[in-house]
Amino acid sequence: DDTETINQAIKEMNELGGGILRFTAGTYNVRTVHLLSNVWLHLDADATIQGLPGGDAPETTWFSDRAYRSGLSPTDPRPYADPENYLTKQDVGHTFFRNAMFFGERIDNVKIVGTGRITGNGNLVTSDKVMNNAPEKRCDKMFSLKLCTNIEIGGWNIDKDMWYDPQKDEPYYIDADGQKNYDVSNMLHIDQGGHFVLLATGTDGI
């Protein structure tokens, strides 16, 4: 589990004013990475960051409409059981942010870039009602950003439009001669992203 080592490195870089944390070839296992301002993550081509069970718990909250809380006590801080709160028109996705593989709140100037791979590794929940799961199985987001600015996630731009081949289930570029080019080694590869691959609320400049 590399979570604490990575989070400590991000914290130290942030305190120094920022920097680039480089992930060289290898596999890095994480629960929840805490993003901080002015710290960029760079993944080399043979680097993989993969999710582990046991990420951060959803933050505590409370809704006045008793029927939509998971508990019966008015002091129960747990999330409501139903995935939608119809009386307040609040989607659960914009209520809980911390149960994610990467989490940032009120941060600025953060990049997660390179040509490596980020995968939930089957450990990010893809269904509603995460509080019905065991505590270590409640992360349902890969990237969760709340009230952030100037965020970049991706590979390297090569000034070509990307297309999708439904037969091969793969992306491709179109070369100058009109041929399909399936070389996407310039991309950051992201898979198994959970219920919300990217949840950005009150966030500008992505």
Language-model region placement:
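Extracellular/periplasmic carbohydrate-active domains that bind, remodel
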Residues: 1-206
